[in-house]
Amino acid sequence: MTYIDPFPGTRGDALGNLAPYRNGHPHRGSDWHPAELSVIPAITSGKIAKIFWSDVLGNCVVQATDDGMYILYAHLAQKPKSLKKGSVVAAHSPIGRVGGGAKTPSGSASTGAHLHVAMCHQAAGVDVHLIPFSQLVDPFKWIDKKGATK
């Protein structure tokens, strides 16, 4: 099963990053920094498992992949209108648009327009944003290992 890099050349903070503004807490995912309102492509195929709002992460979508992972897409500009729980998505299918910037604030943890992605094995549970840090999978490494393509 192939995974894609959603925004090649725009990678930012990785899983575990200890930037000073995180107050000693490790980053719980990986960030990409495309232009605000860029269309976010599904990183791989699967089904939508959850769509929700978080005060910290803003508009979020969780995808259950066909190979047993959950992918959290966070800081979306708005709740996706064309997706609902159970929607089937293929790699490259639109998940939403990048938010978190001046035009589309999305969650208190947003440091400007970007896509935050967190991943875990489905056995850890659908609430990817709440599981223990030790159960998270590094999105950059996973995508690179799984043959990232544009």
Features from the language model and the residues they span:
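A generic structural motif
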Residues: 33, 64-66, 120-122
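Zn2+-dependent peptidoglycan hydrolase active-site motif and core
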Residues: 42-85, 99-115
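Acidic, glycine-rich catalytic/binding loops that coordinate metals and/or anionic ligands
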Residues: 1-6, 84-90, 110-150
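Conserved metal-binding segment of the jelly-roll/cupin
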Residues: 91-101
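Surface-exposed, glycine-biased beta-strand/turn segments
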Residues: 1-60, 91, 104, 141, ...
